[in-house]
A protein has these predicted regions:
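Conserved beta-strand-loop-alpha-helix hinge in the C-terminal portion
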Residues: 209, 217-230
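ABC family nucleotide-binding domain
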Residues: 1-213
Length: 230
C-alpha cells in the first residue's frame, strides 16, 4: 500500500538548513488505521504532505500501491492525488458558494466523470456519512461536525486507495469528534486504509496503530492493544 524508505525533507532559509524529515522509513499495509502523532515541529505534517503527494522529498523513495511516485511530474502527482488519495483537513476546505452536493462532486469534476454519475456517487457518499438531508445546503448553513462529514464524503467519493486526515477533529467539540471517529472506524471496518494526524491521545486510541514523530524521526511505532471503539 504505502512504503517509504529513507525519505528526507529539508528546508533552507538563509544560512539555516532545517531537516524536517531525516531518513524516515515506514510501511503501511492495506486496511490499516494509523494515527500519526508528535509535538509541533516533529515532522508529522510534513510526512503527511509527502505521502499525500502534496510536497516533494529531497531524498529516499516512496511507493504507493506498488508504483514509485518519488520523481513524478506535477501533473502525474495531481492525477494520483485525485484518484488514489482522499484528503480530510482540519479546516474542512469546503467551497462556500456551492451546495454540499456540489462540494462532494468536485473531485469527480476534475476527473471528468459525467454529471449523472457524479450526482449518484456524491449522494451515495453523503448517505455513508449520514447527510442526505443536507445536500442542498451551503457550508455556512451547517454545523462544524456536519462540514467535516461533507469533507469525508468528498474524500471517499472516488473510492481512493487511502484516506488521509490531518487533525480532522481539531476544530470540533467532543460530541462532533466522536461522530467523526465513528465514521472513520466504520470506513476502516469496510476496508478503507486511514492515515490520520492527531495530537489528541483519545482520538489516536481509536486507530489500530500509532506512529510517533520527534525531530523529524520516528521514535515509536506500536499496535494499540486496547483500541477505543466509538
Amino acid at each position: 500500500m504505502i512504503e517509504v524508505k529513507d525519505i528526507l525533507r529539508r528546508y533552507t532559509t538563509g544560512d539555516i538548513d532545517l531537516i524536517a524529515l531525516n531518513a524516515v522509513s515506514l510501511k503501511i499495509e492495506k486496511g490499516e488505521f494509523i494515527a500519526i502523532m508528535g509535538p509541533s515541529g516533529s515532522g508529522k505534517t510534513t510526512f503527511m504532505n509527502l505521502i499525500g503527494c502534496l510536497d516533494r522529498m529531497d531524498g529516499g523513495t516512496y511507493f504507493l500501491n506498488g508504483q514509485d511516485v518519488s520523481n513524478l511530474e506535477d501533473n502525474q502527482l495531481a492525477h494520483i492525488r485525485n484518484k488514489e488519495i482522499g484528503f480530510v483537513f482540519q479546516a474542512f476546505n469546503l467551497l462556500p458558494r456551492i451546495t454540499v452536493l456540489k462540494n462532494v462532486e468536485l473531485p469527480m469534476v476534475y476527473g471528468g466523470v459525467p454529471p449523472k454519475e457524479r450526482k449518484e456517487r456524491a449522494l451515495s457518499a453523503l448517505e455513508k456519512v449520514g447527510l442526505t438531508d443536507r445536500v442542498n445546503h451551503r457550508p455556512n448553513e451547517i454545523s462544524g461536525g456536519q462540514k467535516q462529514r461533507v469533507a469525508i464524503a468528498r474524500a471517499i467519493v472516488n473510492n481512493p486507495a487511502v484516506i488521509m486526515a490531518d487533525e480532522p477533529t481539531g476544530n470540533l467539540d467532543t460530541k462532533s469528534s466522536i461522530e467523526i471517529m465513528k465514521i472513520f472506524q466504520k470506513l476502516n471496518n469496510e476496508g478503507a486504509t486511514v492515515v490520520m494526524v492527531t495530537h489528541e491521545d483519545t482520538i489516536a486510541q481509536s486507530a489500530k496503530r500509532v506512529v510517533k514523530f520527534l525531530d523529524g524521526e520516528i521514535i515509536g511505532d506500536y499496535v494499540i492493544k486496547e483500541r477505543k471503539i466509538f
